Amino acid sequence: MNELLLQGLSELGLDVSRAETLERFSSLLLEKNEVMNLTAITEPDAVAQLHLLDSAALLPFVDLTGKTVVDVGTGAGFPGMPLRILKDDFDLTLLDSLGKRVNWLQEVCDELQLKRVACVHARAEEFAMQHREQFDIATSRAVAQLSILSELCLPLIKVGGQFIAMKSVDTEDEIAAAKSAIKTLGGHIVKVEDYTIPTSDVVHRLVIVQKVSPTPRAYPRAFAKIKKAPL
């Protein structure tokens, strides 16, 4: 058993009995990474810290119980998969635009017998048009600039729900530049919280956005327009 993982879960006050399943997920990730580009982090201790514990560090800041959660641009399943392994009392949608990643995530969910998970192959802006304001919480980690990410995520969230962006700490300018977009899309930044990944000295940042009003029907735009002219 990975000692860093056990220590980190303990520091976060989380159920250490889930460490075995998290470690199995890590093994499946590194095994598949040999034939598919899933992660540049390939050392087990680094995976434990920079993927598993980084994702788990979200839990003290948000109550997922009974919620509908969408992980936008989930990639290899972060933060969504560790959140699901650690907590099984919410509904999770893992959303990614690359079909082979989504297929692999479904295989992992089956292998680990994870319930209440939907693995969806779709572009976020197209998915948002079909599932407008249907989720309580949207998460996203290191996917895009916050102004772009807000247009992909906020349309998915119900009024009263939250969008949580996981960022690096050097994002003051990025956050300031995104405030107008967030307001236009019906959101309001309620907290910017820095946290240290357990067992490491790496500091990351959460940007927590509350959905305070419906997103105008004009959004999200086609991704080419979002990228060319961010709000």
Task: Label every PLM stretch briefly.
Residues G160-D170:
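Conserved beta-strand signature within the Rossmann-like core of class I S-adenosyl-L-methionine
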Residues E31, V35, V47-G66:
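Conserved alpha-helix/loop element of class I SAM-dependent methyltransferases that forms part
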Residues A56-A142, S150-E151:
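Conserved SAM/SAH cofactor-binding pocket of Class I
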Residues M1-L38:
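N-terminal auxiliary segments of SAM/dcSAM-dependent transferases
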Residues L9, N33, V108-C109, K179-I182:
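Conserved hydrophobic residues forming the short capping helix/wall of the S-adenosyl-L-methionine
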Residues A176-L231:
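SAM/dcSAM-binding transferase cores
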Residues K87, I157-V159:
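Helix-to-beta-strand junctions that scaffold the AdoMet/dcAdoMet cofactor pocket
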Residues R101-N103, T171, I175:
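Short alpha-helix immediately C-terminal to the canonical SAM-binding loop
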